[in-house]
Each structure stands twice: as C-alpha cells, then as structure tokens.
Amino acid sequence: MGHSDSSKTFRILMAGNPNCGKSTLFNQLTGLRQKTGNYHGVTVEKAEGIFHHLDHSVKILDLPGAFSLGGSSEDKQITSRVLIGHEAGDRILFVMDASLAERSLQFLLQILELNVPVLVAVTMKDVLEKKRVQLRLDLLSNEFGILFQYVNPKNGEGIKELKDRIVSPKAFCLPIRSFPWDSERENFLNDLLNSLSTEHSNSLKFVLTNSLKELSGEILQKGLPGLSLFSETPSKLIREKFERFGKRFTYLEELTQKSIYIKKILSTAIVGDPIPNERVLSKADKILLHPFWGLVSFLGIMALVFQALFTWSEMPMDWIESCVRNVGTFVGDFLEEGPLRSLIQEGIIGGVGAVLVFIPQISLLFLFIGILEETGYIARASFVMDRFMGKFGLSGKSFIPLLSSAACAVPAIMGTRTIENKSDRLTTILVSPLITCSARYPVYVLVIGAIFPSKNILGIFNVQALTMFGLFLLGMIASMFAALVFKKTFFKSDSSYFLMELPAYNTPSIKSLALTVFKKLKAFLSTAGQIILFISILLWFLANYPRIDSSLYPNLTDAELKKIQIRESYAGHSGKFMEPVLKPIGFDWKMGIGIITSFAAREIMVSTLSIIYGVGGEESTDDLKEALLKDTDENGKPVWGLSNSVSLLLFFAFACQCMSTLAVVKKETNSIFWPLFLFTYMTILAYSTSFIVFQVWQLFS
C-alpha cells in the first residue's frame, strides 16, 4: 500500500453515493464545528467542518452525493470538479453503503483512478446483518490496496476508531490497482501512460481514458476532462497510437467490464446465508409504494404531523409565553412610564416575543421532516408522487424540493439544482413558494387559534390542526396547477424521467436529527430574527408618533387612548390610505399594516398585530388572540370574523411575502425577471383568491 504523508493539518474530501450516510458521518465527525456557504461561481451549498484529534487538525469538505464523476446538474459537476482538481495533500474519505456495495464500488473505481490517497468508511452494516450476510472488508482491502472500515454514523459506533485511523499516517493509501480493462486495452493504456508520465500526473489515467472514449466517438459527461486537456504534442501522440491500436473505448464496454470485475470481487467478499428478497423487503412498502394507498398514506402521515404540531407544542409554547411575559414585567418594574419603556416592552419584547412563542412548532416541523428523510420515507413518497406529478408536467425529482418548502422555500429552491431538466427546474423554483412554509405558521396558528374552535373530530384530529393541514394541501394543489400552467405555456419541453433506487429503511440518528433541527432553527432565527427586530422597532415608532395630546380626551381609559394614538399615528394614516384597496378582500387598516410589513418576512405579521393592538411584553399570545376577537369597527361589528379570517389565511397561503425567497430566486436563475414574475403572479393570485372567497361569502351570508 502507498501511504500518504504524516502532516498534522490536512483536508479530507468526503465523497459517496446519495443516501449512503455521508452527511450523517460528517455531522458525527465535526459536530457543531462546521459552516456552510456556496462554491465559487455557482449556487451549490458548500459544507465544511473541522475536527481536532490527537494533535491533528483535520478540515473536511462534504461533497454533494453522486453516483459517478460527471453529470449535468450543478451539484454533480461540483463533486467532479473538486475531486478531479484536488489540491496537493488532499485525501479522500469515500463513504460506501455496504447494502448497495456494487453501486458504491462503481463510483469508487473511478475515484481510484485519480491517484489520491483514499480511506473507505463502510456504512449500513446493520442492514447487511438483517439480511444475514457479511461483507469481508479484508478481501476488499487486499484487492484494492486501500483500507476499509465499518462505521455506524447513526449511533456513533466506530466513530472514535475512524478518527484514530484518519490521523494515522498509514490510513489513507494510494491504490495498488484501479479498474482493469481487458488485457489488450490495459496493456495499451499502460504503454500510453508511460509515454505521458509528465502530463497531468495527478489523474493521468482518468483523463487518458476519457480522451480515448472521445476518440471512440463517445460524448463525455459534462464536467469531465478529456483530450482538450493535453497540449498539442501529447494529443497528437494519443491520436496516432489510438488509430494504430484499432479498438474502441466505450461507456458500454467499460460498464460491462466493471460489472464483471465487481461481481467477481463481491462473489467472494459477501458471505453468509441471505434471506430471500421477499422477506427482506419491508411489508410496509406494499402499502407505501402502492399507486393509491401510497398517496393516502402520505396524506395521512402529513395530517398526523400537523396534529402533532398543535398538540405537542402547547406546553413549550406556554412556557415561552410565560418567559416573555416575565421579562416584560421585569423590565417594566425598572423603567419609568414613558417612550423608552413602551419601546422595550411593546416594540422589542412584544414584537420579537410574539414570534419566539412559535419556535416549538417550527422546531417540531424541522424534526418531523428530518425523521421522514432519515427513515427513507421521503424517497418512497417521491416514487409514489412521480405518477401523480407527471399529470402536471413534473417528475418525482421535483417532489423533494417541494416538500422541503414545508420547512423553508429558500433551501428548497437551492435544492432544485439536482434537477437536470432546465424547464422542470425553473418550474419547480416558481411553484415552491406556494407550499406552506414555517414562516407562515405563526400567522396560521394565531388566526386559526383565535377563530376556529378547538374540538376533536373522530376523537383523533383537532379542528385547528385539520385547518392547518388543509392549508398545506391547498399549497400543494396550487403548486401542481401552477406547474401545469407554466409547462403548457412558458416551459414547453420533453417530459423528463425519474430514475431512483429506494434506500433501505433506517433508524434515525438522534444526534444527526438534533444537529439538523439546531442548524435550521439557528438559520431561521438569525435571518428572520434580525428582520423582525428591525421592523418591530420601526413599527413601534410609526405606531406611537406623532403623539396625541391626551388632555383632549379627559374621560377615556388608557386602552381607549392607545387605540386613538395608533389610529392617528403614521402607521394608522398609512393603513387608512391602503384601506380602499384592502376592503374588498375583507381587511381593515390594521390588517393592511400587517400585510405590508409581512412582505419583508411573513412572521412579522404577528409582531405587527402585537404592536398595533398594544399587546406588549407583559401579555401573552392568548391576550393577542383575545384582542383580535374584541376588536370592533365604527359600527360595533367584530373586525375579525370567519369570512375575513379565511380571506387572510388564503392571502398568506398564496402571496410571496419573503425577501429571502426573492433573493435566492434571483441568485438561482441569474435573472431579475423571474423574482419579479414570481412576486407578481403570486400577489395577483393571493388578492384574486381572497377577493372571490370574501365577496362570495358576503353574498351568501
């Protein structure tokens, strides 16, 4: 075995197939010592981390999952570009799925041609054990001349041993052999390699093989280096020798030879008495993958998720409300009555605290989506949804970004990079914001909690939870029909296909889930939190100035004076100015102010209402709900009724009230036109839907 140098500071490139446990292993190795960004010149997320062990400092780069080098999507091109263009001293940690050994070895054989020190971490040992088989890593090590080690990223088994091995000078090895062609082609390749030993020595065999494929009439996958990489003299030499050789190097020949080679290795490396396939396949798949029952199962699972969001979050929400209320009281005891106290209590504590209350529900949402991903269910849902989505011009490949929008549309839109078909990708980007996201939940919970009764149906589902589930379904249906319209008008193209291999069922890693929830919640608070704080302070000023002369209203209570103050403030006059446009959809001037501020971020609607209704840090969300229900217009009629509350929910379901979403659409499409188009069509859709529903409701009520 050829070993790497013993430097105490080096970089590891983590590579592997999708769903092999690579990112979970990355989390186990780096913990919270990681950061995300984008690769230079593209929008693919870059995940980096560091771990320190035995006086070594190891930098790890988690590359996007791929099945081979090359590909048409941005993430696959990045993986290829980083691996092929590796820096001196880099090492590759290849993560291999033991349950899909043949597929993993196909990719590994390509990587071995890059002439980089490699260590292989083998996952899914537990899946093999359930099948009553073993994968002999010693035989694989002897065959390739590199080290293979079992590790379980989900429970941490083998992590310490892997860290020990990573910092060992003998861990990362140069392979003693790579994929062998038949004897004639292999001899020809070796002869050429000896002639070109000074050219591109890092990955010479890989580049040379690609060059011979080009000369054989093959079109290289996007991002792969070929004949153009060589200068004129060696390029001419390769052409001349290839023409004299007379045999072609084709993808079909390579795939055939690789399959024979890998099957021969695994025939001895896989030992045991395997259970028949019928017993290995989960009985659940008979239901979850069924064309009809699979769709019903998906809807049922999502209904249970929304039910849990309401029932499980009640206690932590009450606790956070109590904390916010106590902080408001504490601050109020130290400050004298006046503008500063009002700013801190009503503007900062009241505004920001009104949104913080909903963190338990948002955290639960991130947790449930993480569980569905790690168990392998999301892949099965994609398979089931492929046929359904095909009727609307999309493939199952668009399903994962769409479902990811239930957490946040920003990473979901970034996730469309895996969609090779450009029209499918752009369509998915434009319809993803229609899916109910976590930023809408504070508004939904507030309005639904105030207007809809909290009673059970069938003894299981809460009416409020079912209402929120209905809004989620509405977003899914709207996105499908919007996709159909776009595919029939703007993005006419051939239908794309969806090819996937279902991952095995897995037990979620508690540590990985905790890290996922933590990172997403941190991102939510760091981005939305800053906007909420700024808007809350600005809105407090607009709602409290210019100050009214209270001596003009000697017989009014403080609550009545506060109403007049807001009505006569800058915010009040702005709301009154917009009221003629908003009245046809059932909104008064207070709702109008909330609508305008929420275009910065949807959750600001709650902060806005909290400030406008004067619910400060000493009150709770229940007080805000009560304030909404008690609010009346000039005629003494309730401002918040069922008709305009439904109208408001529909407006939030369809409007694009998120600056971050518009920014990421511009970044992903590299055009200002598409975010403007997205904002325009969603705003028109939101207003027209609310208008129709409210006016029809008024007509028949």
From Swiss-Prot:
Gene3D superfamilies: P-loop containing nucleotide triphosphate hydrolases
Binding site for GTP: 16-23, 41-46, 62-65
Membrane-spanning parts: 292-312, 352-372, 394-414, 429-451, 466-486, 523-543, 645-665, 672-692
Key words, A-Z: Cell inner membrane, Cell membrane, GTP-binding, Ion transport, Iron, Iron transport, Membrane, Nucleotide-binding, Transmembrane, Transmembrane helix, Transport
Protein location: Cell inner membrane
Cited InterPro entries: Fe2_transport_prot-B, Fe2_transport_prot_B_C, FeoB_GTPase, G_FEOB_dom, Gate_dom, GTP-bd, P-loop_NTPase
GO molecular function, one term: GTP binding
Domain FeoB-type G stretches: 9-172
PROSITE patterns linked to this entry: G_FEOB
UniProt membrane topology term: Multi-pass membrane protein
GO cellular component: plasma membrane
Keyword Transport: yes
NCBIfam families: feoB
Function: Probable transporter of a GTP-driven Fe(2+) uptake system.
Family stated for the protein in its record: Belongs to the TRAFAC class TrmE-Era-EngA-EngB-Septin-like GTPase superfamily. FeoB GTPase (TC 9.A.8) family.
Descriptive protein name: Fe(2+) transporter FeoB
